[in-house]
């Protein structure tokens, strides 16, 4: 299989059927595969720690959805709020009219209304769904809210060997603007509970547990460790890596996912949590409890570790692309973000031709790291901060401060396509660009 085929696989070949499914209504009277009801809830993060938010089906995270790769899937979205809402199917290669971005042409779900979406989910792996839109200064909206959940697209072939599967979904609460006009948070959670408040994850010695880690944060990158254990990373953003690695720490930017298997070989009660003590103290952790073990969960700091995408890559050299697009990232006056000197909606669209390979060069001329997300496609990391790479396929990549990251994509899913920084505050202040097919 060629590198172009690898990038094109998992959904591009089924584009015709995906588009047809999206544009045709399901049979009259047919039940949807899933229903998402958007509404206001009171979420108890811990005893005497309740907050108001908007969520799916009265819970945070929303229900874990499962779909079969290549099999049409229908979701009914019911909006019980007074605001128009949008659900984005993050990581799926589906048509723009159902992707869940207003900029691509997906219609909102009107207040107190409902809408059905039918699409063919591809590629397989850990995907997710979340509210998509602008929040501005309203820190209760969009990705600041509880509107997020895990979507597992089950492969048409064997998914691999593990004994148990555990979702780990990260989020923060009670956001506010600090003195630097950045967003900070008072409370943190994993799976909707603060450390010590939720049920522990029950495991047994000898198990191989697959942790599906999703950072559903609006703005923050997190570093996670599981005391006394290591993670064997097998997939990034739901895509298998060519070179699985055992690491003591997972670094996960907003919208990123990491699939990692842990060999349960140290009985006890341990903390899986943020390596930064202030965030653990504010709730970012969950107890991992072996059968028969008792006592308070323990924390042991991991060894120093630097997260590096290229460690999971192969040894091939990236072929020459058919075209290049360089995107220079800068911050302008008024806390606006620019790409090549322009802020959305004035950014120049990236023009591509179908079935050609393009290299996107992100040149970050700021001190902040930026998680860059491309809708409806995935890309291959070819160079990261000066280090060549191959085979690591993602839909969101962190671009470190003052560094360049290069990624290759095959333009094989025609239609308007949004690309943006997945830091909500940056997205709200111009950090977006459209990709269009010529």
Which role fits each region the language model picked out?
Residues 17-46, 52:
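C-terminal segment of N-terminal export signals and the immediately downstream linker at the start
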Residues 117-153:
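Hydrophobic or amphipathic alpha-helical targeting/insertion segments
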């Amino acid at each position: 299989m060629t590198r172009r085929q690898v990038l094109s696989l998992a959904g591009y070949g089924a584009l015709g059927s995906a588009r047809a499914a999206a544009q045709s209504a399901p049979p009259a009277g047919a039940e949807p595969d899933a229903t998402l009801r958007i509404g206001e809830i009171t979420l108890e993060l811990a005893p005497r720690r309740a907050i108001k938010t908007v969520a799916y089906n009265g819970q945070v995270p929303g229900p874990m959805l499962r779909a079969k790769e290549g099999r049409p899937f229908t979701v009914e979205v019911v909006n019980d709020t007074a605001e128009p809402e949008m659900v984005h199917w993050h990581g799926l290669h589906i048509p723009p009219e159902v992707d869940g971005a207003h900029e691509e042409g997906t219609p909102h779900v009107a207040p107190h209304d409902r809408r059905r979406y039918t699409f063919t989910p591809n590629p397989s792996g850990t995907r997710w769904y979340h509210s998509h839109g602008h929040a501005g200064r309203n820190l209760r909206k969009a990705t600041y809210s509880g509107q997020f959940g895990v979507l597992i697209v089950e492969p048409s072939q064997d998914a691999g060997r593990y004994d148990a599967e555990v979702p780990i979904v990260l989020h923060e609460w009670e956001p506010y603007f600090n003195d630097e006009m950045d967003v900070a948070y008072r409370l943190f959670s994993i799976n909707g509970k603060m450390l010590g408040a939720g049920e522990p994850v029950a495991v047994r010695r000898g198990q191989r547990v697959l942790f599906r880690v999703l950072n559903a944060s609006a703005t923050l990158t997190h570093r996670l460790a599981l005391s006394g254990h290591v993670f064997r990373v097998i997939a990034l953003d739901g895509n298998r890596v060519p070179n699985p690695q055992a690491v003591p720490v997972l670094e996960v930017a907003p919208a990123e996912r990491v699939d990692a298997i842990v060999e349960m070989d140290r009985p006890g009660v341990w903390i899986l949590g943020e390596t930064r003590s202030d965030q653990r103290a504010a709730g970012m952790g969950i107890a991992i409890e072996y059968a028969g073990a008792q006592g308070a969960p323990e924390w042991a700091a991991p060894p120093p570790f630097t997260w590096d995408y290229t460690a999971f890559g192969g040894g091939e050299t990236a072929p020459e692309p058919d075209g290049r697009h360089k995107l220079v990232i800068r911050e302008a006056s008024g806390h606006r973000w620019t790409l090549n000197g322009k802020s959305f909606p004035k950014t120049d669209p990236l023009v591509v031709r179908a079935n050609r390979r393009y290299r996107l060069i992100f040149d970050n001329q700021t001190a902040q790291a930026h998680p860059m997300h491309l809708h409806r496609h995935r890309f291959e990391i070819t160079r990261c901060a000066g280090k060549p790479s191959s085979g690591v396929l993602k839909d969101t990549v962190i671009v470190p401060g003052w560094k360049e990251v290069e990624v290759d994509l095959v333009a094989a899913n025609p239609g308007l396509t949004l690309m943006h920084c997945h830091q909500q505050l940056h997205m709200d202040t111009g950090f977006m660009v459209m990709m269009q097919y010529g």
